[in-house]
Amino acid sequence: MLVSTIGYQISQNSDFDELKKLLLNHTKRAYLVGGSVRDAILGIGSKDYDIEIYDITPDKFDALMQECGAVGVGKSYFVYKLKNYDLSLPRTESKSGYGHKGFSVEYCNDERIASARRDFTINSIMVNIFSGEVLDFWGGVSDLMAKRLRVTNPKTFSDDSLRVLRGVQFAARFDLVCNSDSLKIMQKIDISDLSANRIYLELEKFFIAKFKRRAMELLSELGLDLKLFGVEFDERFIQQISNKIHTHKASFLYHLINYYAIDGKSLISRLALPNCYSISYKQPFLRRVSKFELLKIALDMPLYQWLGLDSKARIKMAKDLGIYDCKFSPHIDTASIKTTGKAYGDELKRLKIEAIKDYLNDCN
């Protein structure tokens, strides 16, 4: 679809009618910006919009926002939240201290200059919500169409090291390859200043993304596979991950931990990941499966919850056995077990194994 058509569709989107009425007497230069435009071009639906508003002073903007009941999310950054809009004034940012808060922010009423602060060109495209005019000062549209990840401003990109990990998750989500000049810039950036939480928030997007190969290749080129996960990704592992069906955000770590025989508990702790990721080292791992082994796992969980159910063949086997959506729950006469303690547990386990064998014999 032509980008001009996207611009027209955005200008006609009824989601912006209320906002246009609010801004009409103040400006005709209000732009949909950032990921909202990128996603629109890619045909990805969104109900949350980032709007950048020009031709209004910070004082008048603050007054207007308070009048309409918008909630400020950082006055020094001129950003307000109104329903599903993030409304902001155009700005420039310059590094003035350490960490992600060490920035000086200045109001800027020039679209080209303001858009230069965007991390990658694919996020620098702007669409006027009144006219549908598309502003693409940095070639973001052509980069998006070519599936190319390219830094917008080489001079300021390194001001925030988080941009490196943002690049990784963009590669994973949108099937992008980093161009050579941008790669060289990113390779020089140390991410040691980032908190564990900021790193996790970007990694999580990678964990659930479709094109993991792109991100893994980029992580490897940046040396971040070793820094973050303690191993260097080899082509066999990258290919293996590419071929797997991933249904849970812990799937990548599950395969990483078992492929490289990593201490999963230590890795999860070092990355400060939430407890939900502990299943990546707690769940059983099988290189080859049989009906018997699947039924054993299904004693504890329906198999759709098992991270090892990662291929069409395994999914089909689970469904054929009737254990995809529900656990395998054979009738066990526990009253017949006359022992206690560990002996009781051992006998119960033996009876369950016998029940699995009986079930398979009946199936045959």
Each predicted region: which residue ranges?
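Catalytic cores of the polymerase beta-like nucleotidyltransferase superfamily
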Residues: 1-364
